Amino acid sequence: VLNNIFIDCVPSLYIDARGLGWMADSPLRWIKEAEEKGTILGIAYNQPPYSTRYPKLANILNDEPKAPKGNVISRNICVGGYWDKPAGFWNASIENKARPYLTMEDNVVAPSSGVKDSLSKSFVIADPLFVNQKNPEQGKYQLDANSPALKRGFKQLPFGKIGLYQSD
């Protein structure tokens, strides 16, 4: 989850540890298939194009295959809603069993957003400083040059290049 802007999302994130809990049997079937056929759900995960596009995938069975490893949550902005705080139907936006396996860094969460742990080092609570503070959408969600998100590596989103293109 890299370089996103979450506006009034409840929750902004949802990451569970299903392989360590209620779905613990499913990974066992995938592990058996990988050992017998060299595939997971019929996909040759350890061969191109998967092994070249996702090099860490080739070793997925060698290091706690049931754990939600490899998830990176970095350089995101959250305004309103809930960043990592449980809300409504969701018992947890980030399951506690999953947290030790995550890499979370350089995220900016606006003071108006709900957070589970305000002392977390995975984010800073700060105004992201949209160019058009009163109506970020009208300002195409562009950030002021002094934005704390830009200082943490967030890249401006190219909204002018996103969307439908006319066919030739």
Model-derived regions, located:
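Glycine- and acidic/polar-rich repeat regions and solenoidal domains
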Residues: 1-121, 126-138
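C-terminal accessory segments
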Residues: 65, 119-168
